Swiss-Prot record:
Keywords tagged on the record: Aminoacyl-tRNA synthetase, ATP-binding, Cytoplasm, Ligase, Nucleotide-binding, Protein biosynthesis
GO BP of this protein: arginyl-tRNA aminoacylation
Translocase in keyword set: no
Protein name: Arginine--tRNA ligase
Organism, as annotated: Chlamydia felis (strain Fe/C-56) (Chlamydophila felis)
GO molecular function list: arginine-tRNA ligase activity; ATP binding
Subunit structure: Monomer.
Reactions catalysed according to its record: tRNA(Arg) + L-arginine + ATP = L-arginyl-tRNA(Arg) + AMP + diphosphate
Assigned EC number: 6.1.1.19
Name of the gene: argS
Length: 562
């Protein structure tokens, strides 16, 4: 139970005791914005004044009179009727002992669920770009956090491995046998040539369309070329995932091909389809456009595939929750998809599906992040540049470091910096990409968190301690110790809100706050050689474990030295 839920339970019981006529009270508890207001604040009194026809302050006082006070050093009514709570140091000490055990085992939910997270999803024969970076690391972070609390998580890569483009590519490869395609760069160049010919040459277009039919019919020649194209792309994608430390299971669009005809038949049987301009569509009240599920030429589209995927994930994967991570530009599509899946009975309720949308990555001028020629920046090149920038940063700030040490640390620092900069931005917001900012040692950056972690490793080395004791006794005396203890105990709340809102920035905000509290503790409370060395090392141990856990959930790596 988090501190927030503990207080919520107390306030609910106190409200019912003071005012039995209030039905199902739902306490509004928040973390105090300023330390002199205490640790937490209850805002219920202002919401109950109309119901109870009483002054908010009188309501607050009645609630306080019915609260147990054992675990608090202070419970006060302030202002118009706010209730401010300050926990006792003894209570914080007891909670830290429980927190230490929970931190090692994970804050497991009572009722674990099957969560399917669809993220990354690049297209075959195309380079991954910065948009895929956002989907990949947001999806990976959410998967890690859902797993951490005990859920069964299936990470799916819904690769774009089917459609008209493949007929075009197969035709070009058949007719240009001299073209050597050994890697994704070759394939991307070939795609551009094939696309240009498809747009200009009517006969080539017809042959390409015929090859789509051949592919769908299982023609061996077309299938072999298709598999070759997919294998080249997937090898390149896997290199990116290895660099990012992302585990994901491939299940491309082609997987759902056998189910598409029955999806259309099922929608027709349920009388959900309307024919519009010879295309089969599903219309929904409140939407200006329908969801087209079959084109006028009889072909299927990605909406048909997405519906088949939705049904399969519920019926075969037994998903309790489906999360799809794509850019905000696809929001309308997923709203229509959800409405159709609900109407068809593929989703149990609106809680079963969430579209996790994200904003754009911008350059320093506030424009969409692209190359000078206007093309999407290749993700591979961006990651390589991040490592190069980390090398330059280390050479500037750590001139004594050897080339070998730099080569070992730079990849970790560069990739950490890119991930953290993205995850620390609210996912629905656009953010400005800046290597200079993300590699700073101060501010809300991966480097800032890592520096605190490394500082604790330095304490251990100086004291010749291999592993800090997570079972020692805590002794909270100084204000900085109290503030740090409270910050540690708020970690489960950060996990809860991250999962509730499906927004990783709540976790980065927490870790940044914790790091600041630790730095204040390190500044104000002498550790090495002090009479309270063991007790303060215990707090260091909890910070070390919490930072390491939090960074792992973000997909970041730790270092013992910077």
């Amino acid at each position: 139970m988090t501190l927030l839920s503990y207080l919520s339970s107390l306030c609910r019981e106190a409200t019912l005791s003071a005012f039995p006529q209030v039905e199902n009270p739902s306490p509004d508890i928040t973390q105090s914005t300023k330390e002199h207001f205490g640790h937490y604040q209850c805002n219920d009194a202002m919401k109950l004044d109309r119901t109870l026809k009483m002054a908010p302050r009188a309501i607050a006082e009645a609630i306080v009179n019915n609260l147990p006070k054992d675990n608090f050093s202070s419970v006060e009514v302030a202002g118009a009727g706010f209730i401010n709570f300050t926990f006792s140091k003894e209570f914080l000490k007891q909670r830290l002992e429980t927190f230490s055990a929970d931190l090692s085992s994970g804050f497991c939910v009572k009722d674990p669920k099957k969560i399917v997270i669809d993220f990354s999803s690049p297209n075959i024969a195309k380079d991954m770009h910065v948009g895929h970076l956002r989907s990949t690391i947001i999806g990976d972070c959410l998967a890690r956090v859902f797993s951490f609390v005990g859920n069964d998580v299936l990470r799916l890569n819904h690769i774009g491995d089917w459609g008209t483009a493949f007929g075009m590519l197969i035709t070009y490869l058949q007719e240009e046998a001299s073209e050597d395609v050994g890697n994704l760069e070759d394939l991307t160049a070939l795609y551009k040539k094939a696309h240009a010919r498809f747009a200009e040459d009517v006969e080539f277009k017809k042959r390409s369309q015929a090859n789509v039919v051949a592919l769908q019919s299982g023609d061996p020649s077309a299938l072999n070329l298709w598999k070759h194209i997919c294998e080249i792309s997937e090898r390149a994608f896997q290199k990116i995932y290895d660099i990012l430390g992302v585990a994901i299971e491939k299940r491309g669009e082609s997987f759902y091909n056998p189910f598409l005809p029955e999806i259309i038949q099922d929608l027709e049987n349920k009388k959900l389809i309307t024919v519009s301009d010879n295309a089969k569509c599903v219309f929904h009240e409140g939407f200006s456009i329908p969801l087209m599920v079959q084109k006028s030429d009889g072909g299927y589209n990605y909406a048909t595939t997405d519906l088949a995927a939705m049904r399969y994930r519920v019926e075969k994967d037994h998903a309790d929750k489906i999360i799809i991570v794509t850019d905000m530009g696809q929001s309308l599509h997923f709203q229509l998809l959800e409405a159709t899946a609900l109407a068809a009975g593929y989703l149990r309720d609106k809680e079963t599906f969430s579209h996790v949308g994200f904003g754009l990555v911008l350059d320093s001028e506030g424009k969409k992040f692209k190359t000078r020629s206007g093309e999407n920046i290749k993700l591979k090149e961006l990651l390589n540049t991040a490592v190069d920038q980390a090398v330059a940063t280390l050479k500037e700030h750590r001139p004594e470091m050897s080339e070998e040490e730099i080569s070992q640390r730079a990849p970790i620092l560069g990739i950490n910096a890119i991930k953290y900069a993205d995850l620390s931005s609210h996912r629905v917001s656009d953010y400005v990409f800046s290597f200079e900012k993300m590699l700073r040692f101060e501010g809300n950056t991966a480097m800032f968190l890592l520096y605190a972690y490394v500082r604790i490793q330095g304490i251990k080395r100086r004291l010749n301690i291999e592993k800090l004791n997570l079972e020692a006794v805590v002794n909270i005396q100084e204000p900085a110790e109290e503030a740090l203890a409270l910050a540690l105990l708020r970690f489960p709340e950060a996990i809860d809100v991250t999962l509730k809102e499906l927004c990783p920035h709540f976790l980065t905000d927490y870790l940044y706050m914790l790091t600041n509290k630790f730095n204040a503790f390190f500044r104000d409370c002498h550790i090495e050689g002090s009479p309270y060395q063991q007790e303060r090392l215990y707090l260091c141990a909890l910070v070390e474990k919490t930072l390491a856990t939090g960074m792992h959930l973000l997909g970041l790596q730790t270092l013992d030295r910077l």
